[in-house]
Amino acid sequence: MPAFADIAIDPPLADSYRALALLRRDRDGGIAPPAVQMVGSGGAVLERDLPMVDLERLTRGGAGERKACAGAMARAASEWGFFQLTNHGVGRELMEEMRREQARLFRLPFETKEKAGLLNGSYRWGNPTATSLRHLSWSEAFHVPLASISGADCDFGDLTSLRGVMQEVAEAMSRVANTVAAALAEELTGRGGGGASAAPWFPAGCDETTCFLRLNRYPACPFAADTFGLVPHTDSDFLTVLCQDQVGGLHLMKDSRWVAVRPRPDALVVNIGDLFQAWSNNRYKSVEHKVVANAKTDRLSVAYFLCPSYDSLVGTCGEPSPYRAFTFGEYRKKVQEDVRTTGKKIGLPNFFKHSSVQ
């Protein structure tokens, strides 16, 4: 019975793996390369703590504390592209409830998740365009537009309490994302007075109609030695706020090597997206990151993506900027085109004023 339940619940990732492994073997004349070459880990991985920031110093502190907190976030955004937040206002009980609802959602049969139109048909798994194991993500997710969560046409099936929990989580993580983004913007421009309302003009065009909440599950993987949970990438947004469980598996590129992020209970992870790097004239870094597969246990996470409308001009914190003007829609279209034609995302180098990317 347990084996049948696993087959019914999980997407056919093993089938994708075997097909890609066979394709790779055929290309290499019947000899598969070592697993570490497939994953591209580049040797031993250090486990590190991300810079830790107490957000309450920004939201409730005096002028000196607000300035120090914003400065700490700006340094982390410049040096790491990632940091963690404590005292962020997203309650432990709410996130535990979100994990319970998330687990119930992902325990549904694969056919139900894929075909029934749950959560506005936002279900996805693996990578349908993968042509090698380097492009395969051992994961499934619901990538839900915020506006859809409260929509009458968004089907939650029998998960009657999921809508309310997702709405609460989205609202709480939205407050965090906008507070952090405004403070980071103020550090570069000197505008505003600190806190969530410091720079209402930034990020331009970002509101509940343009942002996304993503529910992720990384199933235990029997091929964890040579499979990614999520392939290396940067985020095509302004800023991402992540709530992860204690399983671990998030890795980021630091000083030209992969670093494993040590999970911290009750902390949120923040990372800079491509659009913020462009807006900041490369002061803040959108850093490549990945999730490694786990052979023994599932991993769950919830991510909030702060995105503008497709017609929003990304802009700059000040001239001269190394990037030409572009909209979010133009950026997404180019990313999708590159992935389709080359198998990988090129991203910001396409938008340098004097780009050499062909």
Curated annotation (Swiss-Prot):
It is found in: Cytoplasm; Nucleus. Binds 1 Fe(2+) ion per subunit. GO terms for biological process: gibberellic acid homeostasis; gibberellin catabolic process. The keyword Flavoprotein does not apply. Residues 207-308 form the Fe2OG dioxygenase domain. Expressed in panicles. Expressed at low levels in young shoots, leaf blades and elongating internodes. Fe cation binds at residues 233, 235, 289. Belongs to the iron/ascorbate-dependent oxidoreductase family. GA2OX subfamily. This is Gibberellin 2-beta-dioxygenase 6. The gene is GA2OX6.
